[in-house]
């Protein structure tokens, strides 16, 4: 009988400056560890620290977001499996997720994002030109909300998600 047991928690803190429409957040994912080991060897949970910033432009209905992901594994072999020399810029962009949202009204928005690490990983495996990109939008009519999102998380397929919600 092979079993293992671990306890983990995600923690986050957010600062929001309403006057400047600026937000800064810090999250720590997978804090914790094994309680019962699989084979007497303790394994660490994959700790992930993220820092994100979002700012709405002062004179346009545009919000820009930048998140730095997996900061606890800055130069991990996961980001450089062949052990080659990587420039600071390339290393930095392996941790960057960018997004932009255009919301001309409270009832309509369009959004786009780009995950540099996902793009690099999947393009190396033959991914499409959309690899790493996400697109979405939403519309709110009186009591009905409609949303659509596109993402490419695999070399063989993309996902298209439609959502519909209605207030009671």
Enumerate the predicted regions with their spans.
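Outer-membrane beta-barrel porins/channels
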Residues: 1-168
């Amino acid at each position: 009988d092979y079993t293992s047991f671990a306890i983990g928690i995600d923690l986050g803190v957010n600062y929001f400056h309403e006057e400047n429409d600026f937000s800064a957040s810090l999250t720590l994912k997978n804090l914790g560890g094994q309680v019962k080991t699989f084979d007497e060897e303790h394994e660490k949970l994959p700790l992930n620290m993220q820092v994100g910033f979002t700012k709405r432009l002062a004179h346009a209905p545009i919000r820009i977001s930048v998140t730095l992901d997996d900061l606890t594994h800055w130069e991990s072999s996961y980001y450089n499996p062949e052990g080659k020399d990587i420039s600071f810029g390339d290393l930095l962009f392996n941790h960057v997720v960018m997004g932009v949202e255009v919301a001309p009204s409270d009832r309509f928005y369009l959004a786009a994002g780009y995950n540099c690490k996902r793009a690099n990983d999947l393009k190396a495996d033959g991914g499409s030109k959309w690899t790493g990109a996400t697109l979405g939008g939403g519309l709110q009519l009186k009591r009905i909300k409609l949303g659509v999102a596109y993402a490419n998380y695999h070399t063989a397929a993309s996902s298209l998600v439609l959502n519909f919600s209605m207030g009671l």
